[in-house]
Amino acid sequence: MIPQVVTSETVTVISPNGISFPQTDKPQPSHQSQDSLKKHLKAEIKVMAAIQIMCAVMVLSLGIILASVPSNLHFTSVFSILLESGYPFVGALFFAISGILSIVTEKKMTKPLVHSSLALSILSVLSALTGIAILSVSLAALEPALQQCKLAFTQLDTTQDAYHFFSPEPLNSCFVAKAALTGVFSLMLISSVLELGLAVLTATLWWKQSSSAFSGNVIFLSQNSKNKSSVSSESLCNPTYENILTS
């Protein structure tokens, strides 16, 4: 069976048993438009990967700051769950590796790299969702911690002896601690939300790339090729189709 290049909008494939399969033929973009689209897509991937790496650095830096904060009776329990979960460190690692791998995959588009980028993007999505949940709980717990801090200071301040012996911090220190933690949690939450959106976008791009670029489409076999054991493939003019000829 000799394949014919059909220029009309409808392509009809007739099999040896006489059954026809009509298919719609979509107009293919020109080479210039394809090259322009590829360049635009590569630029977008680079920008998203760079922002992912920046988010990773931000989350990691804020996590280090929280880990180095001295222990506080009322506020340590607020961010201890965040540190014990390991999100500022493990999540930042996923974000950074995902961004770096996206840059590498954009330069060298291979099937293993595309699948690895897709897997890291999915892990980044799950990690960002976990971090957003923990940070939301931590932000909600700041107000009760502030009230406990104020109450403890008020109780100590009513007793002069206790005031002189324990020398409690000024009441403003409770507000300063709450404001500082609110700022840290807010920056980390913004970075996590941004990372979530970017991870979803990159995962979608790599999923489409892995589905379209590495999958076969149509196989044409002649009737006398049933007893052949090997076939060879060659590309047609239309890159979305494959012509399988008997060797």
From Swiss-Prot:
Topology with respect to the bilayer: Multi-pass membrane protein
Give the UniProt keywords, A-Z. Membrane, Phosphoprotein, Receptor, Transmembrane, Transmembrane helix
InterPro entries named among the record's database cross-references: CD20-like, MS4A
Expression across tissues is: Expressed in thymus, spleen, intestine, colon, testis, heart, liver, brain, kidney, peripheral lymph node and bone marrow.
What is the first-listed, main subcellular location in coarse terms? membrane
Q: Extracellular compartment: which residues?
A: 68-80, 143-180
**Domain of life assignment:** Eukaryota
According to the record, the segments passing through the membrane are 47-67, 81-101, 122-142, 181-201
- Residues modified as Phosphoserine are 235
Where is the protein found, in the record's own terms? Membrane
Coiled coil: which residue ranges? none
Cytoplasmic-facing ranges: 1-46, 102-121, 202-247
GO CC: one term?
membrane
General function of this protein? May be involved in signal transduction as a component of a multimeric receptor complex.
Similarity comment text for this entry: Belongs to the MS4A family.
Spell out the protein name for this chain: Membrane-spanning 4-domains subfamily A member 6D
What taxonomic classification does the UniProt entry list for its organism?
Eukaryota, Metazoa, Chordata, Craniata, Vertebrata
Gene giving rise to this polypeptide: Ms4a6d
